[in-house]
Amino acid sequence: MTRVDFYVIPSADPSARLQVACRLAEKAWRQGMQVYLHCADEAQRSELDGRLWSFRGEAFIPHSLAEEDAEAPVALGLGEPPGNHRDLLINLTLEAPGFVPNFSRVAELVVEEPAIRQAARDKFRFYREQGYPLQDHRLPRI
């Protein structure tokens, strides 16, 4: 069954979620996992795309927009994930997508911004009611 991890970030800045998303994607990619970053909108996806290119100085995380290269180890999308991305879903939307059960793990990133925090509470309740194993991670300041 899919395991859902909530990463609680001590920041009110929604862009802190993108920084943590890059860290998680890099770690998963280095472990050989296929990663799907489910973005809320095109602006968020574009910003995340730029961050992944320059995440660690001259190094970058190999990635692609989901509709451009389904074989990239890290895909950024707005809808259904490419067929081979089933290891880690990093969900940056305010809802739990219907394709959650297709993944081994799901990462939900939470900041102190009221709308994001409330959406996270709603998703936590939803996942718990569906019987998903839940894990809570309190991150240090970034």
Swiss-Prot record:
It catalyses: DNA(n) + a 2'-deoxyribonucleoside 5'-triphosphate = DNA(n+1) + diphosphate. One of its GO terms (biological process) is positive regulation of DNA-templated DNA replication initiation. It comes from the Bacteria. Keywords: DNA replication, DNA-directed DNA polymerase, Nucleotidyltransferase, Transferase. It is an enzyme of class 2 (transferase). InterPro entries: DNA_pol3_chi (IPR007459), PolIII_chi_sf (IPR036768). Its EC number is 2.7.7.7. GO terms for molecular function: DNA binding; DNA-directed DNA polymerase activity. Pfam families: DNA_pol3_chi (PF04364). Gene3D superfamilies: DNA polymerase III subunit chi. Belongs to the DNA polymerase III chi/HolC chain family. PANTHER family: DNA POLYMERASE III SUBUNIT CHI (PTHR38767:SF1). Part of the beta sliding clamp loading complex, which hydrolyzes ATP to load the beta clamp onto primed DNA to form the DNA replication pre-initiation complex. DNA polymerase III is a complex, multichain enzyme responsible for most of the replicative synthesis in bacteria. This DNA polymerase also exhibits 3' to 5' exonuclease activity. DNA polymerase III contains a core (composed of alpha, epsilon and theta chains) that associates with a tau subunit. This core dimerizes to form the POLIII' complex. PolIII' associates with the gamma complex (composed of gamma, delta, delta', psi and chi chains) and with the beta chain to form the complete DNA polymerase III complex. Interacts directly with the psi subunit (holD). The only subunit of the DNA polymerase III holoenzyme known to interact with single-stranded DNA binding protein (SSB). This is DNA polymerase III subunit chi.
